[in-house]
UniProtKB/Swiss-Prot annotation:
Organism from which the protein derives: Onion yellows phytoplasma (strain OY-M)
Assembly mode: Part of the 50S ribosomal subunit.
Gene: rplA
Function statement: Binds directly to 23S rRNA. The L1 stalk is quite mobile in the ribosome, and is involved in E site tRNA release. Protein L1 is also a translational repressor protein, it controls the translation of the L11 operon by binding to its mRNA.
Protein name listed in UniProt: Large ribosomal subunit protein uL1
Entry's Gene Ontology cellular component terms: large ribosomal subunit
MF annotations from Gene Ontology: rRNA binding; structural constituent of ribosome; tRNA binding
Membrane-traversing stretches: none
Family as reported in the entry's similarity comment: Belongs to the universal ribosomal protein uL1 family.
GO BP annotations, alphabetical order: regulation of translation; translation
Record-linked InterPro entries: Ribosom_uL1_bac-type, Ribosomal_uL1, Ribosomal_uL1-like, Ribosomal_uL1/biogenesis, Ribosomal_uL1_3-a/b-sand, Ribosomal_uL1_CS
Amino acid sequence: MKRGKKYLASLQMFDVKKTYPLQEAISLAKQTQVAKFDAAVECAFHLNLDPKKVDQNLRGALVLPHGTGKVLKVAVLAKGEQAKQAQEAQADYVGDQDLIDKIAKNWFDFDVLVATPEMMPQLSKLGRLLGPKGLMPNPKTGTVTNDVLQAVKEIKNGKIEYRLDKSGNIHAILGKVSFDETKLLENLKTLYLQLMAVKPRTVKGTYIKSVTISTTMAPGIKIDPVTISQ
């Protein structure tokens, strides 16, 4: 894959083979920005997990203390009082069968879909449409719930979902390059603590194999996992 001049120049700013203390790695990530826009700061945790094992296939959600810098569009499938709560929480779209019908016609003008348990039987028919896009509501991520007021508020306040991929990685957006380093650090530590809290008991050996941080289109910088817990 051919790399641009800015990408190649950013590689000269750090040692790709070295692991850096958390604070220094965050600083380097901001310095090595390649994109001309306010790029996202992303991290990847490579975990000693087998996604084929049910108890090790991690999936969940958490609220980052400083959000991600991105305002997400939220659609809510609910009726009656719960629909009113969704509107109160400033969900972008609220409906029931009317929204399901729109989605069935390939309407996806939202980032997160929240549904009450009552709506799931009708929505489950659209699994083939929503599943591949990562939009199917799931109890593990808090998007299937009767408390739609709280669900929408959390999403609007910086809640992110995480899921182990086929290679054993958890990818997450920590914020924007414009964020203070302290905010990025606290967001990353929050994710780290969450991953430690849900560590499967069946894990043998080192749980966190490696951690990298980067900005959009920029090279990854390795973080010393030990410095995250300090």
